[in-house]
Regions:
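Nucleotide-activated donor-binding/catalytic signature segment of Leloir-type glycosyltransferases, i.e.
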Residues: 236-257
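Conserved donor-binding/catalytic core segment of Leloir-type glycosyltransferases
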Residues: 7, 185-211
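Conserved acidic donor-binding segment of nucleotide-sugar-dependent glycosyltransferases
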Residues: 309-310, 314-320, 329-334
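Short hydrophobic beta-strand element within catalytic cores of glycosyltransferases
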Residues: 294-297
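N-terminal strand-loop element at the rim of the active site
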Residues: 8-69, 234
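Donor nucleotide-sugar binding/catalytic pocket of nucleotide-sugar-dependent glycosyltransferases
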Residues: 57-58, 137-180, 194
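Glycosyltransferase donor-sugar binding loop
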Residues: 37-43, 195, 222-237, 255
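Aromatic "clamp/platform" in nucleotide-sugar-dependent glycosyltransferases that forms part
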Residues: 277
């Protein structure tokens, strides 16, 4: 098999940086070559693969809609594709997805799109949701959506209109973060941990309602909220509500810190909390599971793909009293907490440990590569939900049950 060149398109920020970086660094296929087209103002460390820095192409890729910058990014990306001649494009999130899918369509290169939570979920405005949904549908082209969870895959088919043949799935997966060591954390007072920018998606104002309920019931648990920094549109509203509720002594806000220090906070916590309105598949929860933490999370897309209700944590509707009930229960019941911690760790190793999961991402790349070049025989594997997956002969065809839910 000749070298397969894979072009990633997306901002190297936060969870996208982790996803792109891990999918390159932990892929052991020697024949792969990688290029990253990322935002010209992204602040990140270079990706090192086998001792060599992966080539990056800066483009005008920004979060907000800007017709002039977006057109510039598209032109830059098309030029990069024609110059680099990738075999496969893998584009990420809303803006990278629009640019990448359109550029792939223009140049005729097979394209994967991982939404990391569809863009139309990001706003309560019905008009904006309709606009974002329309953009998602208009830029489907012949793209393969590569969802990061089954619930995101289902959404791609039922709401965005992807065919089952073009709706694939590969779970977000991460290294074993329990092995990382950061700065020492003061754990003299027990605390619960939460990671996320103060923004609409992460629902921080509801979290404050929960914390107030917990405090009003006489529970002195502290809360450490990590990731307060880059692009935090609800931070001022959050601080105002903390003051209104008198929660300054109950909450510690931590700015954007390095990954090892962040994981140290998670490791020393009693358990992990998420109040998100939606997710793709949350890396923060997966890393909390790697650290053997019980999870209390909202019952939404993404969260429900990694939390088994009543086993490694709880999935809850957005009801502050229900959250307070489970928080206080886990604070007081060490035996239950320990049981859930063990289950979280086991689920991580089984379903989300990247060294066990990366081969399934490569299988997806191989499938599309071989459809493009026709250079290998393809095997049709029936799945347990009457879908089909194509896998090239000569590669690992023993698919985990989660990957057997996809259609290709």
């Amino acid at each position: 098999m000749k070298v397969m060149k894979i072009l990633h398109i997306g901002q190297m920020i936060g969870g996208l940086d982790i996803y792109i970086r891990n999918s390159i660094v932990y892929n052991k296929v020697a024949e792969n070559e990688y290029v990253i087209a990322c935002g010209e103002e992204d602040k990140h460390q270079p990706v090192i693969k086998n001792g060599t820095e992966v080539q990056e192409i800066p483009i005008a890729l920004y979060r907000s809609l800007n017709p002039f910058k977006d057109l510039k990014a598209l032109i830059q990306t098309v030029k990069a594709i024609r110059r680099e001649k990738p075999d496969v494009i893998h584009c990420h999130s809303a803006k990278g997805g629009i640019i990448g899918r359109t550029a792939g369509w223009i140049t005729g290169v097979k394209t994967f799109y991982t939404p990391h939570a569809f863009s139309y979920l990001c706003t309560p405005s019905k008009l904006k949701r309709w606009v974002f949904m329309t953009i998602e549908r208009l830029t489907r082209f012949e793209t393969y959506v590569l969802a990061c969870s089954e619930s995101e895959q289902e959404m791609a088919i039922k709401e965005v209109g992807y065919s089952k043949e073009h709706a694939l799935v590969w779970h977000n997966a991460v290294p074993d973060s329990s092995l990382e060591r950061g700065k020492m954390v003061d754990k003299s007072e027990p605390y619960a941990c939460y990671i996320g920018r103060p923004c609409y998606q992460k629902n921080p104002l509801f979290l404050l309602d929960v914390i107030k309920k917990v405090k009003d019931r006489g529970c002195n648990l502290k809360f450490i909220l990590l990731g307060v920094g880059y692009h935090s549109p609800e931070l001022d509203a959050m601080k105002a509500k903390m003051h209104e509720f008198g929660l300054e002594d109950s909450i510690r806000l931590e700015p954007w810190i390095n990954h090892a220090d962040c994981q140290e906070f998670v490791r020393k916590s009693l358990f992990y909390i998420s109040t998100a309105l939606y997710e793709g598949l949350p890396l923060a929860i997966i890393e909390a599971m790697a650290n053997g933490k019980a999870i209390i999370a909202s019952d939404v897309v993404g969260n429900k793909d990694c939390v088994r209700n009543g086993e490694n944590g709880y999935l809850l509707h957005l009801d502050a009293d229900a959250y307070a009930d489970k928080i206080i229960q886990l604070v007081n019941d060490k035996e239950l907490r320990t049981s859930m911690e063990k289950k979280s760790r086991a689920l991580f190793l089984e379903e989300f440990f990247i060294e066990n999961r990366i081969k399934y991402l490569q299988n997806q790349y191989n499938m599309v590569y071989n459809l493009r070049y026709g250079g290998a025989n393809l095997v049709l594997l029936k799945t347990n939900i009457d879908n089909v997956i194509l896998v090239s002969v000569g590669y690992d065809t023993t698919l985990h049950h989660e990957e057997r839910r996809v259609a290709a």
